[in-house]
Amino acid sequence: MSNIVWHAHAVDKQSRAEQKGQKPLVIWFTGLSGAGKSTLAGALEQALAASGKHTYLLDGDNVRHGLCGDLGFDDAARQENIRRVGEVAKLMVDAGLIVLTAFISPFRAERELVRNLVGEGEFVEVFVDAPLSVCEERDPKGLYKKARAGEIRNFTGIDSAYEAPEQPEIHLLNAGKPVAALVDELLTALRLRVLID
């Protein structure tokens, strides 16, 4: 690696952000399967796009079709999954985008790794907090049922740990609130932190 040099470009992150008229950042949704991460990230992206923001949504299921298609679900593979996504998110922030991510991302250390990759003030952790019982009841993909039947191993919340964020920038309780109300909470919190206008 000592022969590989990072090339600085004349058009930098600040130039790209000014061109887009926004502050680039990563909005990192974390929580159990079925907590509502993808739904909320998608709804927030729609609201941001409607207000003229330049966004991109990285979804946990989608990256497993390509970028992370070679990875399994043991702890080491989950860590590598988040590392790769963090590197992609960093590049997208450098491009001046508001990047939304929807990943279980069960381990604090990996979420911290991404926070440090992206940089100070450009990472917003959103804990979508839904009780396990609510997530199991929703079970949109039937995964909890399979995990309880022993058909899926290393399933977060069942036989693999989820380390809840200790100090997320935004903590959303999602046990039945309408999506629109939660998106309003998100937008308000982002505006209060002067991350969006």
Curated annotation (Swiss-Prot):
CDD domains: APSK. One of its GO terms (biological process) is hydrogen sulfide biosynthetic process. The active site is at 105 (phosphoserine intermediate). Gene3D superfamilies: P-loop containing nucleotide triphosphate hydrolases. The keyword Phosphoprotein applies. Its EC number is 2.7.1.25. Pathway: Sulfur metabolism; hydrogen sulfide biosynthesis; sulfite from sulfate: step 2/3. It catalyses: adenosine 5'-phosphosulfate + ATP = 3'-phosphoadenylyl sulfate + ADP + H(+). ATP binds at residues 31-38. Pfam families: APS_kinase. SUPFAM superfamilies: P-loop containing nucleoside triphosphate hydrolases. GO terms for molecular function: adenylylsulfate kinase activity; ATP binding. The keyword DNA-binding does not apply. Keywords: ATP-binding, Kinase, Nucleotide-binding, Phosphoprotein, Transferase. PANTHER family: ADENYLYL-SULFATE KINASE 1, CHLOROPLASTIC, BIFUNCTIONAL 3'-PHOSPHOADENOSINE 5'-PHOSPHOSULFATE SYNTHASE. Catalyzes the synthesis of activated sulfate. This is Adenylyl-sulfate kinase. It comes from Aeromonas hydrophila subsp. hydrophila (strain ATCC 7966 / DSM 30187 / BCRC 13018 / CCUG 14551 / JCM 1027 / KCTC 2358 / NCIMB 9240 / NCTC 8049). The lineage of its organism: Bacteria, Pseudomonadati, Pseudomonadota, Gammaproteobacteria, Aeromonadales.
